[in-house]
Amino acid sequence: MAMRVDQTCGSEEHSPASTQRSAQLFADACAVIPGGVNSPVRAFNSVGGTPRFITSAGGYWLTDADGNRYIDLVCSWGPMLLGHAHPAVVEAVRKVAEHGLSFGAPTPSETELAAEIIDRVAPVEMMRFVNSGTEATMSAIRLARGFTGRAKIVKFSGCYHGHSDALLADAGSGVATLGLPSSPGVTGAAAADTIVIPYNNVAAVEDVFAHFGDEIACVISEASPGNMGTVPPLPGFNAALRRITAEHGALLILDEVMTGFRVSRSGWYGLDPVEADLLTFGKVMSGGLPAAAFGGRTEVMSRLAPLGPVYQAGTLSGNPVAMAAGLTTLRHADDAVYAKLDANADRLAGLLTGALTEAGVAHQVQRAGNMLSVFFTDAPVHDFAAAKATETWRFPPFFHALLERGVYPPCSAFETWFVSAALDDDAFARIAEALPAAARAAAAATPEGTA
């Protein structure tokens, strides 16, 4: 059963008096920004209450405009794996900024970061930097079409690849949170060449290629989806995508905007080394600043302008501040950091399982490396249909019970939880103290209570 979506701006249902400043800031924002936010999931529409306006962060702590502090289990939706305001990253950004923010010209740091990524991810032989994950996937799709001379693309229900028109069809992330099948403004023509099939279903992939094989330019999939909740590929699924696309002369694009350099030094490729033709990156690779990238084998990437005819450009692409933040983050994310991230995810998953089991709540804590999600169901979730069928109405009271006790989880049942390497024993003690009440709130929830 899907949760109710509250489309109002500034609901006070779950907002204690200590959020008065955030409430005022939200009201001010609603007057000049649609919905008061610049990315829909931030509006708390699916959980109710007032979005917390964050004014500072350090390590694993977030501080809001009212002075409330929260243990951060969102990490800016993934990038802050070292923790907030890591001294080395801050210093690198400061040093670069002193010499200028953007030049509209090549800089050495672009080549350095590209070389670092190429060294980590074997299928990537050349890179192009852009400004967002949406740009990365949109550009990769254009390149795949230009390379193959074909028009159709295949994506999976619940996989989110940014908000370009062709990729919004049956997407996850905010589209799932808002209960929208796509988006008004996406024309039939824009989506006509997008084929959407169930995730983790090899037979569906084979069937669509049997019908449209010589028309399909590419298959795009999240390397391990995190935008319908954490729903990892079944063993061999990505390898099957590689096999089927190769058999039909189509390209395989694996979207690692979320998983790239988050789940391992080499991203999801380090855990499941399937050699895609193109990969997309973002979040961690830019250290939390606006930058992303796509890359792949030279034969494909050399079709990009100015070498080839496929056009792609960006005024701020490869800006030196984001390059410095990304390069410093990657160089500090050594094996010890990834071991700490995995251990922290293990610890959080154990606390979640223990509290929810004690409260008698049917649940699944699903993992993809150090990424995880909580689904309120007694069966594993392998696709978007199963994710939408979970008891999502238990999530709002669960979320608010944690928030009111100083723990900041994702504000949607369809988003992934992220840990940082900064989390320590004190943080986990506080999380452990908050979870029993949250689990009891989930247990007491009813569909009518959040309808």
UniProtKB/Swiss-Prot annotation:
Catalyzed chemical reaction(s): (S)-4-amino-5-oxopentanoate = 5-aminolevulinate
GO terms classed as biological process: protoporphyrinogen IX biosynthetic process
UniProt keyword Transcription regulation, yes or no: no
Assembly and interaction partners: Homodimer.
Family: Belongs to the class-III pyridoxal-phosphate-dependent aminotransferase family. HemL subfamily.
Entry cofactors: pyridoxal 5'-phosphate
Name of the protein this chain belongs to: Glutamate-1-semialdehyde 2,1-aminomutase
EC number(s) given by UniProt: 5.4.3.8
Keywords: Cytoplasm, Isomerase, Porphyrin biosynthesis, Pyridoxal phosphate
Subcellular location: Cytoplasm
Pathway as given in its UniProt record: Porphyrin-containing compound metabolism; protoporphyrin-IX biosynthesis; 5-aminolevulinate from L-glutamyl-tRNA(Glu): step 2/2
This protein's encoding gene: hemL
